[in-house]
């Protein structure tokens, strides 16, 4: 551990990734003070996959766009590093993404600079480079798309650019991590969505040919990468190598897209004898029709959209050589073990 790391402030620490960030800092940096800033408190009941004591974690409830709220948390935590993992879920209105991902991040950067925080680690997304086309072994030299596919990744890219622009080796050092396809214990979006679709009888349908490799990443590995980044960005021997850089974070073992979903469904007892396969062009057409009808006639969110079809059917895997070399990152939990942990957590019924 870097001797400089004494205190970490985790923005969004009550969320899915946030709880795993607390856990990994607790495990790997036992002498580091951990503070959480979030709009919601830490959960009262935790899965067995979390060993930290919530009562030992200093907590601040606040608004990321409030100078005062952020200043209070930074001043009282006396943090060396801020880990900013707060972000709304997919599928929400654009104004929410703008407020949290863009305005909130810019406010956090401004306050951190004024209060002389040493470093900030930002949780970006591998989706910031996705334009609907195949992403094959992409590295950090790939550009942002001219037109983003969705509001979430558009604002994550804008926030990432702001974080990179704020990097100053004489003041606030910054680094961005781009995890892909996060899953694991505590997930409240991917797994619940899969379970809901199975209950509606949708597990028998397959969009695309399932020949597309996809990066699923175990959440504990993503949290490990953040701990490494926080340590490296304070270490005098490594900080110049990672300051102002972006890093893809994956399990380094892309698998066919539907593998994870069918493993979850099988655990729940949904074992389909056959699949109704919708070729990509057909699925995409249905996506456009569904989106039009839902928004213009039914006045509700569509169940299937062109964006979702493209995400499901595209090849999307990334090269993590840079993270291995400069962060010393390697996925400690393999894909099969991560899926088993997730299934075990699902059966806890928390």
UniProtKB/Swiss-Prot annotation:
Task: Quote the catalytic activity from the record.
Answer: 4beta-methylzymosterol-4alpha-carboxylate + NADP(+) = 3-dehydro-4-methylzymosterol + CO2 + NADPH
Q: What class of enzyme is it?
A: oxidoreductase
Residues holding substrate: 125, 152
Would the keyword Ion transport be found if you checked this record's keyword annotation? no
Signal peptide stretch: none
Which GO MF terms does the UniProt record name? Answer: 3-beta-hydroxysteroid dehydrogenase (NAD+)/C4-decarboxylase activity; 3-beta-hydroxysteroid dehydrogenase [NAD(P)+]/C4-decarboxylase activity
Its localization reads: Endoplasmic reticulum membrane
What the record says about the induction of its expression is: Expression is repressed by amphotericin B and caspofungin. Expression is also repressed during biofilm formation.
Q: Which Gene3D superfamilies match?
A: NAD(P)-binding Rossmann-like Domain (3.40.50.720)
Question: Might you report a single GO cellular component term?
Answer: endoplasmic reticulum membrane
Biological process according to GO = ergosterol biosynthetic process
Its annotated pathway reads: Steroid biosynthesis; zymosterol biosynthesis; zymosterol from lanosterol: step 4/6
Q: Name one Pfam family in it.
A: 3Beta_HSD
Catalytic residues of the enzyme:
156
Protein name in UniProt: Sterol-4-alpha-carboxylate 3-dehydrogenase ERG26, decarboxylating
Organism of origin is Candida albicans (strain SC5314 / ATCC MYA-2876)
